[in-house]
Amino acid sequence: MEEVIKRSSRKNPVENQILVIFGSNGDLAKRKLLPAIFQLYLDDLLPERFAVIGAGSQEKSEDVNRLDIANSMLEFAKTGAEENPDKLQSFLEHVYYQQVNNQSEEDFGLLKTYIEHLSATLDIPKNIIYYFSIPPFLYETVAAHLIKYGLNAEEDGWKRIIIEKPFGYSYDTAVELDKNLRSGFNEDQIYRIDHYLGKETVQNIMVTRFSNGFFEPIWNRKYVDRVEITASEKIGVGTRGGYYDSSGTMRDMIQNHLLQVLAVVAMEPPSIFDSESIRNESVKVLQALRPIKPSEISQNVVRGQYIETMVDEAIQKGYRQEKGVAPNSRTETFIAMKVFVDNWRWGDIPFYIRTGKCLPDHVTEVVIHLKPAPHQLFKQRCVAQSTNMIILRISPDAGVAIDFGMKIPGAGYKVQNVNMAFHYSDLAENKISEAYERLLLDCMIGDSTLYARIDAVKASWKFVDPILQEWKKNPDIPLYFYECNTWGPKEANALFGNKELKWRAPFKKFKTD
């Protein structure tokens, strides 16, 4: 498998192309997309001839647009903007602007004319990526306008669209969105981006499992007791209150990010390491998720909402005090749930998923708890020893750690757990790419491995939809409140069904964990 991974990772050629960003004046474009493209440029990963067209509603000249982007690079680019002013200037020469009202059909006719002009002037083939950095309710409108003017046609070059989550608001709306997109774009033209899958350390879960002979043989129900997946955020909803109150944690985090991480952790080895084989195996996991019946929701899902709390001698707002949030909102900002994957590898092994806002630290990790040795020879001699763990830290301070028992030096046989860890920061010569850098480059070369396929989207919605519907229908299902800077409602520990078990509380700095 290791050789297969090495062969498949050889760099594909990046063809000359045009990238159109709808919503180019928005936060996502300024903070993430344009800095990522600039970093690819600094790393010499972009083709010789390329153009980036910002498509925004504001009226402004090319010069003003380039000045705006230069300021964004200086503020948000990781490296390079201040250190390489000449590089920044040469990058800006590839950036253009066209005023587009996304709801105006005529503006897309003008966009088509502008693309044709740039293609001819710059000698760039009509290989085009359309990035939908816009509110989801505009996806179908923009796609329809592109189709109307033939901007989806591939006779003169390939065309691809990238859409951000959420991919629908429910199973039915996801199916409807796909139907409308597919009226003019094939599945292999649609790239559904999930930036979690673009994280280097999420991708490394597959390499950790499938290229190491001492991990994969124990990655199953015979040796694994349980799996924990945590994605905690220290901040509240901030300025996203209006969006969040209609979405909630289940739609914002569980349905996409964390179920995708679960799929990577639980999937079978693909026969070959290519896009379709990997996605075939990951979707099988999502399709094997055991449905949670309405009568089982309270025992398997805990939802919470943060409340006003005094933190470090300052009052931190509760969720209901956030701007755009209803004063009696029952929207969840925390979820902990127990999930089962009903297949041969994982039958009856619980996966515990936890995510929330206003928690003590911003941490994302996967913890594989192994079963104890069949005979506890040193049970009476242990000093705070727990079962063995494999900890896959996704962020921050990314790395992998193995937690196991060792004898304390000195007389007798006292045993305690120690940590053997690898940290990505130790690879000083290798920079960890930002998720959007990797994902944009993958789309440019036509690699959809790390993008969500429609069957995976449908499978994840099919799993969470009944829970959301029951919450809406049944007000008696509890919504627990928790203080900011805590690990959520204490009721989340009841999911383990064992008073001796509780959620792992990770440190922000993995090296002290």
Mark where each language-model region is.
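Secretory/organelle targeting and membrane-embedding segments
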Residues: 1-163, 167-513
